[in-house]
């Protein structure tokens, strides 16, 4: 369905000219592993050859969990010369190039390469005739802390994060002897001005750097939790949007680091306060027309509602990709503006799917509110598209919208209404995914080999260790038994 990325002679020439014009000293080839970690290998510009840009760069794939065994470790990084930018943090002039992974044994794009999977999902949409392009836009929330301490030993398990904004510092004597006292408090941080908002200058610096690397931002503000922020960037096609998430996370972490802070996109680092999500806006277009625009509920089309029906039907297994950590499910609980009930509504932030207000047909879209940034964006976006396409093909009814505050529903009321909820654990979401995976495998977008590698990695690296480790809270509840 998809062939190896081959950079044209004109693209290669254009890239070399770009490097010379910008006096580039290093070329930094970057790729994403299964978990979503951004990895890189750099070459001096003087060592760069035409063949490397045409045929790729060899690397050892056995060093990345879930990929190759050491007996078949050779893979190729294929540079994508439509996506590159000057690294604003490098001491020397370095250009970052997005790469796909190519399988030298099967002579095809590597089926465990997340970026290749995202490309296959977009191509599957085109080949199906349902649409030409799927647009995604992510709103990534994050925390910026002053420091963090972590210990993971057989006799001791703990973490400690700190922030000047933290309510726990109300009685603290700082080094200069002054405690200014302006703090947002738990769930009190939505859009206050300084001095309560201590991170304004860091966020504006983040925006400036994002603009430097080609990301157009449209909103920046303090979020609800203490030490929490959000920067929204413009939408793009599925692959571009996932690339943008990787760029955004890199910039946020680096700007915080250079300001003596530490940034995290972890979904739930603070108990008793709001967590961080990755609200994901989606629309599908064909012949330059928004297929989600129509005459049904809130200006949506039948196509859009069927797309939504597919996502809601598959959401419990979809969560294995959109909410990909054990920590994700500590965010998806009532009371912290994180949706756990699988329904939809217009302008209702308690629903797992929101239909935002739009002033034109072009703005018709869904906002999926359950994903978070512990996910690999290439996999999360691809899985959402595959679920939606399944809904369109099979005309899946999403049910009635629920224009009420869903956070106020009791468990009995949820059961009486027959409403599904998100899984409560990563284990459960993985089990749901394994029981409901056929839609992912259409056109081999997600291969069986990849699905098995993914679930094995998640169980062994996250689920099993989490289930086997004593937790500090258990010592409070159980030590004196």
UniProtKB/Swiss-Prot annotation:
Q: Which residues of this UniProt protein bind Mg(2+) 2?
A: 141, 223, 230
Q: Which InterPro entries match?
A: Gln_synt_N, Gln_synt_N_sf, Gln_synth/guanido_kin_cat_dom, Gln_synth_cat_dom, Gln_synth_gly_rich_site, Gln_synth_I
- Top EC class, one word: ligase
The cofactor note reads:
Binds 2 Mg(2+) ions per subunit.
Q: What is its EC number?
A: 6.3.1.2
Gene Ontology, cellular component aspect? cytoplasm; membrane
Could you describe the subunit structure of this protein?
A: Oligomer of 12 subunits arranged in the form of two hexameric ring.
Could you identify this protein by its name? Glutamine synthetase
């Amino acid at each position: 369905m998809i062939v190896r990325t081959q950079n044209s002679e004109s693209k290669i020439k254009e890239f070399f000219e770009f490097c010379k014009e910008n006096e580039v000293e290093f070329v930094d080839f970057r790729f994403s592993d299964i978990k979503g970690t951004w990895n890189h290998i750099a070459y001096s510009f003087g060592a760069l050859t035409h063949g490397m840009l045409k045929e790729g760069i060899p690397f050892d794939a056995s060093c990345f969990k879930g990929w190759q065994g050491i007996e078949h470790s050779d893979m190729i990084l294929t540079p994508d010369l439509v996506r590159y930018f000057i690294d604003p943090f490098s001491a020397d002039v370095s250009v970052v190039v997005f790469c796909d992974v190519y399988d030298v044994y099967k002579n095809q794009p590597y089926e465990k390469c997340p970026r290749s999977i995202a490309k296959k999902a977009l191509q599957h949409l085109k080949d199906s005739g349902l649409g030409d392009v799927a647009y995604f836009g992510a709103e990534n929330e994050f925390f910026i802390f002053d420091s963090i301490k972590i210990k993971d030993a057989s006799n001791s398990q703990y973490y400690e994060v700190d922030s000047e904004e933290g309510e726990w510092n109300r009685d603290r004597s700082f080094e200069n002897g002054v405690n200014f006292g302006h703090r947002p408090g738990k769930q009190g941080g939505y859009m206050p001005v300084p001095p309560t908002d201590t991170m304004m200058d860091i966020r504006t610096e983040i925006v400036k750097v994002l603009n430097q690397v080609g990301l157009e931002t449209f909103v920046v503000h303090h979020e609800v939790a203490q030490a929490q922020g959000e920067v929204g960037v413009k939408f793009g096609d599925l692959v571009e949007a996932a690339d943008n998430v990787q760029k955004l996370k890199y910039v946020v972490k680096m700007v915080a680091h250079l300001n003596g802070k530490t940034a995290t996109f972890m979904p739930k680092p603070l108990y008793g306060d709001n967590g961080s999500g990755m609200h994901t806006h989606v629309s599908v277009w064909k012949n330059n027309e928004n297929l989600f625009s129509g005459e049904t509920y809130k200006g949506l089309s039948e196509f859009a509602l069927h797309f939504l029906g597919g996502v809601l039907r598959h959401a419990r297994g979809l969560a294995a990709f959109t909410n990909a950590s054990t920590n994700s499910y500590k965010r998806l609980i009532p009371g912290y503006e994180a949706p756990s009930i699988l329904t939809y509504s217009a302008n209702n932030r308690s629903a797992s799917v929101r239909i935002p207000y739009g002033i034109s047909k072009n703005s018709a879209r869904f906002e999926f509110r359950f994903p978070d940034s512990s996910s690999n964006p290439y996999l999360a976006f691809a899985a959402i598209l595959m679920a939606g396409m399944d809904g369109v093909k099979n005309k899946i009814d999403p049910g009635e919208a629920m224009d009420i505050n869903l956070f106020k529903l009791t468990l009995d009321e949820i059961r009486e209404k027959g409403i599904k909820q998100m899984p409560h654990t990563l284990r459960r979401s993985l089990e749901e995914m394994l029981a409901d995976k056929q839609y992912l495998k259409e056109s081999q977008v997600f291969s069986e080999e990849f699905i098995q590698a993914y679930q094995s990695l998640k169980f062994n690296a996250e689920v099993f260790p989490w289930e086997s480790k004593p937790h500090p809270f258990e010592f409070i509840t159980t030590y004196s038994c």
